[in-house]
Amino acid sequence: MSRAVVDAKEFSHAMSKISKVLKKCAIPFLEEVCLRIQNGRCTLTATDLETWFTAELPASGDDMFFAFRKTKDILRACSHFAGELTMEFSETRSGSKKVGKVLLRCERRGAEFEVYDGADYPNTPQASEGDAFSVSSARLSACVERVRYAAEKPSVSARPAAICVQFCGNSVYALDGTRLACDTLEGVSFPKPFLVRADVLAHLSAFGKEDM
């Protein structure tokens, strides 16, 4: 059995934030949050295979790696926790598959859930060295909101670039072939030009005013 401790409120906030990307899916994993505790950090990941959200918070104790089975139930349970949240993770083998359970305990409250093997969760893409950058979520979100009206709505006939917001230098702009909207982010320099679908950028609101 592995045992680790995190701050309950911080954990609940992070779970709530990244789970906004989850939606009903035929692939069970894509409705769940994956958890990895390693080197004193708890990393939570959620994805729909187009957008990836991760959040990190301090943790103490043993390493563990799994994906929740009922993220929505975990969110409800965590909303009642405060103080130190203890996670006790155990797994057994059933044929070639690992079967795991996690017990969440906070003072006198507790709940046990079945979990998936974390090794089966989709791997998070890693940015190439030099491609990562930091920016205020609030500033970026405000900038995107000022230009995204000029991006075309996603459709079968839409050109990929037309449904995206584009980033280059310190400029943020959208162009659907008829309209052009442009804004700048002073003090920010994007490592190289890239595009992101305008509807996906709505998830920026989940980060609030934090840097990312």
Regions found by a protein language model. Give the residues of each.
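Structural preference for solvent-exposed beta-strand-turn elements
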Residues: 1-212
